[in-house]
Amino acid sequence: MDKLKIFNEFLDRDEAYETLNYFSRNFNKGWDPWVAEVQSPTGYVPGNAFWRMKLSDEKLFSERILKKIESKTNKRFTLLDVYGNGQTNGQDGSWHVDDSQDGTYTFLLYMTYNPIIESTNYNTIGGYTGFSINGLIINVEPFTNRGVLFRSNIIHRGLAPQKPNIFRISIAYKLKEIT
């Protein structure tokens, strides 16, 4: 597999609408402040703070979109976790790996909706996901409804929007490949 596999327009129109509507309806509930622990040379240390929404109990995410991930990637997965990441200006993520075990993958689905992030505005909004691969930093634009699949041991971080009053949303799937 290539290091990163990108899927533009991952969800069809109705699925994207339903997903965006879910976050719009639940904006004022369900987002909890969260500080991830990140691995450093001296052990685990607190990373930067951002927002997190548990999605594992929602069938839209834990079943329907998971099946779409499997269909589009031609892989079968066990779902380890799924949650929403939320970031506002100043909440850049820390460099980290999600899982160092063999056969684990992360799938990110960008779902920022106010505004929709697309090719005409991404350069002023920011919110890239940075990947450190073979000594290079590769930034992936967080276009709304774009999916990115990568092995969970790749060092990466989510960058916050450059402008205030924008809430960058990505859905993070933690997956174990079934072989």
Residue ranges and their predicted role:
Residues 52, 63-179:
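Catalytic core of non-heme Fe(II) oxygenases with the double-stranded beta-helix
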